[in-house]
A protein has these predicted regions:
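Catalytic domains of cell-wall/extracellular-matrix polysaccharide-remodeling enzymes
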Residues: 129, 133-159
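Proline-aspartate-enriched helix->loop->beta-strand connector
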Residues: 113-116, 120-130, 138
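Short, small-residue-biased leader/transition segments that mark boundaries at the very start
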Residues: 1-4
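A structural signal for short, well-ordered beta-strand segments and their strand-loop junctions
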Residues: 87, 123-127, 157-162
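The feature marks non-catalytic terminal segments
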Residues: 152-179
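Active-site environment of divalent metal-dependent phosphoester hydrolases
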Residues: 43-47, 66-68, 129-134, 166-169
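Active-site rim/loop-helix segments in enzyme catalytic domains that contact anionic ligands
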Residues: 7-118, 147
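Short His-Asn-centered micro-motif
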Residues: 37-41, 127, 136
Length: 179
């Protein structure tokens, strides 16, 4: 397991500059064949946790919410699941309001391009276009990853996290499933 925080920690990340090939090389991603890109630490567990048990994932979080607890939980998840991870430092909130990443999209795209083209990924996984339950960062992550994935690849190995359902509609959803 490896993650990066500009120090030999379990998770790589916490940065003010762009992701570099040299930095990705330092993570020794040879055993990682799958890429998971999420908006926040804990999204990898909530939306993609079962997949992490398969190992071989490089998990990238776009923001940590400047939250030490979430960083530590991410590090522990990556360590315990035997995967590798990177936390970037794009803003979660600005002046108490959720950031729309307006001034950061070009930088996010540059980082996504570096990561997506770093090596051949057998699978790329991210938030679904609806942002699971409509979270703006999940929606934007999905949109940016999808855009850059198809700009760089001509294949269909991009996958989205499943649909989120509110508790009150679960019986209706369950009744629509095949037995």
């Amino acid at each position: 397991y490896t993650t990066l925080f500009r120090s030999p920690a379990y998770v790589t990340g916490i940065r003010s500059s762009h992701v570099t090939v040299k930095e990705l090389d330092s993570l020794q991603l040879e055993d990682c064949t799958k890429l998971m890109i999420v908006a926040h630490p804990d999204d990898e567990t909530i939306w993609g946790g079962a997949h992490l048990a398969d190992k071989g994932y490089f998990v990238v979080c776009l923001t940590d919410g400047y939250n030490k607890t979430r960083r530590n939980e991410f590090q522990n998840t990556i360590k315990e699941s035997g995967n590798k991870g990177l936390i970037l430092r794009y803003p979660d909130k600005v002046h108490g309001e959720r950031s729309n990443w307006a001034g950061d999209k070009k930088d996010i795209i540059k980082d996504l391009d570096t990561i997506l083209t770093y090596k051949h990924w057998n699978m790329v996984v991210t938030h679904n276009p609806e942002g699971e339950y409509g979270h703006i960062h999940h929606e934007m992550t999905s949109q940016l990853v999808t855009q850059e994935y198809y700009r760089n690849y001509q294949k269909n190995d991009l996958y989205y996290f499943g649909q989120y359902y509110k508790k009150k509609v679960l019986p209706e959803v369950e009744s629509s499933l095949r037995s």
